[in-house]
Regions:
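Non-catalytic structural scaffold of enzyme domains
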Residues: 19, 42-47, 65, 104-107, ...
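NAD(P)+-binding Rossmann beta1-loop-alpha1 motif at the extreme N-terminus of oxidoreductases
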Residues: 1-61, 128-129
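Short alpha-helical
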Residues: 12, 39-40, 73-74, 100, ...
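Active-site capping/gating segments
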Residues: 116-132
Length: 158
């Protein structure tokens, strides 16, 4: 996969996805991570040998795919920050945030975007998860394939 991925949020689930991708030989130079919490940022950078920043916009501009791994209570604010850029670049949007629908995410980012909503489970942290994926009507077959490849790094996909 020759896709650049912007991880907006670098918590445990993002870490497991990134770790799985690296184990599969994914080019780490195509992984861009933003994480607001300094101790998590430092740990992620050291553990996975990645540059991790505290700048969602910088990361978003580097990614063809935006993977949102932020707490649900901050999702709307994060989307507001990135809305203009999302509309200008039309990235594939993937979210693992609990309780946020694909329709909400699309609306918060300005609409008419390809959005995949993923429900990973806890065993994904060990690479043994089962991930349920839902794609809205704007997600094409190539984008579905990308989303499936990303989450196969943590287990099964349906």
């Amino acid at each position: 996969m020759n896709t650049s991925i912007a991880f907006i949020g670098g918590g445990n689930m993002a870490r497991s996805i990134i770790g799985g991708l690296l184990k599969q030989g994914f080019d780490r130079s195509r992984l861009h991570v933003s994480e607001p919490y300094e101790p998590t940022r430092t740990a992620l950078a050291e553990e996975l040998s990645l540059q991790v920043v505290n700048d969602n916009m910088q990361v978003a501009l580097a990614g063809q795919v935006w993977l949102f791994a932020v707490k649900p209570q901050v999702m709307k604010a994060v989307c507001a920050e990135l809305r203009e850029t999302a509309q200008a670049h039309k990235p594939l949007i993937i979210s693992i945030a609990a309780g946020i629908t694909a329709a909400q995410l699309d609306a918060w980012l300005g609409g008419n975007l390809p959005v995949v909503r993923v429900m990973p489970n806890t065993p994904a942290l060990l690479g043994a998860g089962a991930n349920g994926l839902y794609a809205n009507v704007r997600v094409d077959s190539g984008q579905k394939h990308i989303a499936e490849q990303l989450f196969r790094a943590t287990g099964l996909c349906t």
